[in-house]
Amino acid sequence: MKIQDRSLLIFLVLGILKSDAFNTRVKRHAPIRFQRSTRQSVVHFEFLDQEYVVDLEPNHSTFHENFKVFTQDGPQIVPRDEYIGTVREPRAGRAVLTQLEENVYIGSLYFVDDTLHLEPSYPHQLSDDLGPVVGYFESDLDLNLDLSAMPVRNQVSFRRANPFLKHRRAIAIPSDRRKDVLNVKRNRCTLKLVADYSFYSIFGKNNTGIVTKFLVNMIARVNEIYTPINWDVGKEDDISGRGRFQNMGFSIKEIKVLDRPNASDSHYNSYSRIWEVERLLREFAFAEGSKDFCLVHLVTARTFREVATLGLAYVSYKKWDETAGGICSKQETFNGRVAYINVLLSTSFANSEQSTYPLITKEIDIVVSHEYGHAWGATHDPTIDSDDPDVEECSPNDQNGGKYLMSQYAQKGYDANNVLFSPCSRKLIRDVLIGKWESCFQEEMTSFCGNGIVEDGEECDNGVDTDNEFNCCDKFCRLAVGAKCSPLNHICCTPTCQFHNSTHVCLPGDSLLCKADAVCNGFSGECPSAPPVRDGQECLEGGECLNGVCLPFCEKMSIGKKSCICEDLELSCRLCCRDYNGTCAPVPGHVYLRDGVRCSKGSCRDRKCVNEVVDNVRNYFLITFQTTGGVLEFIKTHIVVIAIIFFTLIFVGIYKIVKYGENFTEKVTHKTAGGCRSVFVKADVN
């Protein structure tokens, strides 16, 4: 699909589905055994014979300040058990967790080289109870979805040197400009999430609280993808009085849980009907679209008539006078019915010709992030075989960095561009943000003393701890008398509020990441950077350590090349390296990539590259021409415009006929008067 097609409706379609569901897609998984902690702000669990320790703090930024939960019976009170945190052991990372019940958490742990997902086992029929949680690493997945939109090395923020020191990162803007750059504060697209009865009954186990926690954790994970992105890269000189478009994400303003099906067969919450996805989204827009939200999202667990469809969204345009759709959409009228089409939908159930099965956490993140991206204005980068003038810049070959994140084809991430947005994608979303952020984006929930983050004006912050296990920090976020630090904020701090000595290991080493143990310095609460292990030591995926960095296999000193993916489909599933002259070729020995690893146009299966994810694209206006009723609806909706065009064409036609007649008369008059040596010139009516 070419970028100039300016598509407005995006289908995220699963091209190839496997029938053995969870165990096929997750090659290695294990139950999680959570351990009770004596401190509310710490969670312990075991996974694959390793102990994980995560320090938690409340996750406020995912919520709007007026957050509410409704069912069909009215407003509900649901406790907030959502957290972000820092992984302390076995290695540094960042966590997004939600507590389903006591000592039961779901969410994701983001490490520099992998992500650990924790999710309930009951949707996959691995258990009938709420309690059992299954864990798996992304590296053990064999998915049929594009993995390129997920957090990778350059998109997830880590503080490896000091995972306990959680100072909020502020955008560097002079204080005299802060009051003039509202978008630095108004950085959240407010959401209304509507969970229909299918999602409520299947994923929520008929419990409003569980549904709410599922949805909040989902948006928190999506924010981990969006908020690190700087949409103004290369355009900082054009900011002109506003702040940088960074830390732009989502906040939930309202959750609506439909705890029983609607009796009307035409209602979007009808449980018996099998919907066409376009019709479902349209009915949802009539019922729930609203100017009070940036986006309104239908979350369902139903399948559709269109096999393998997982989501549908309207793409946003940068100007209000252009076609409505996506974020901050204006009001539209269809056949006398008013609707706001700032709507999208996603399902948590995959449907193939062979079977249906629930998506895993990773797949849900991809579907939702993909649809939100289109709602923000992103389309696909042009394909290499297109005639788009931007194809060279936005879809470079492997020799020039590889395909970008918004490529139509999945990428593993070997090339530099695989984790970046192309100039085309950045421009599209940036243009939409420039035109619309001020109309419907709102301020991220503000911080305060007690959120576990050491911010400007604070010396410490005990966060959610309410016990008196540590008396280093008072309720005003000031250090107690005689205290030098707080162990809840500084890893090199003892329980007696003093600095650890210079032999205390504050960050265990990880040989696979080429890092040795980091030790405290004895005069600071911060943990110094971890020193490197010896050069030449083996690290991840057959790589080699050099100056504390894990070089990929192809970049080992003994090989001296670059990692790449062979573009030739016949060679794409072999281990390839790029020579200094730019040629990407397989390494000797016929070394093949394992199943599930990304290749040039999808992922490898049985040593072949299989094309997996396709976005079927249609223009929004074409929806109404699908049927005869759609044509009549379109005519009724746009009758004034059609009438103007019709009469304009008639007027132009009459004008042309009159002008032709006048010109013909002039020529005849001039010819017949020539013998009398007189010339009759007819006045030009023009």
Swiss-Prot record:
Glycosylation positions in this chain: N59, N206, N262, N501, N581
Signal peptide: 1-21
InterPro entries on file: ADAM10_ADAM17, ADAM17_MPD, ADAM_Metalloproteinase, Disintegrin_dom, Disintegrin_dom_sf, MetalloPept_cat_dom_sf, Peptidase_M12B
Residues exposed to the Cytoplasmic side: 659-686
Residues in the Extracellular compartment per record: 178-637
Listed EC numbers: 3.4.24.-
Location (main, coarse): membrane
Requisite cofactors: Zn(2+)
Binding residue positions for Zn(2+): H370, H374, H380
Disulfide bond residue pairs: C328-C440, C394-C424, C506-C527
Gene Ontology MF terms in the entry: metal ion binding; metalloendopeptidase activity
Domain spans labelled Disintegrin: 446-535
Residues of the Peptidase M12B domain: 187-445
UniProt cofactor note: Binds 1 zinc ion per subunit.
Membrane-topology annotation of the record: Single-pass type I membrane protein
Location(s), subcellular: Cell membrane
Pfam families in alphabetical order: ADAM17_MPD, Disintegrin, Reprolysin_2
Pro-peptide region(s): 22-177
Top class in the EC scheme: hydrolase
Protein name: Disintegrin and metalloproteinase domain-containing protein 17 homolog
Taxonomic lineage of the native organism: Eukaryota, Metazoa, Ecdysozoa, Nematoda, Chromadorea
Gene that produces this protein: adm-4
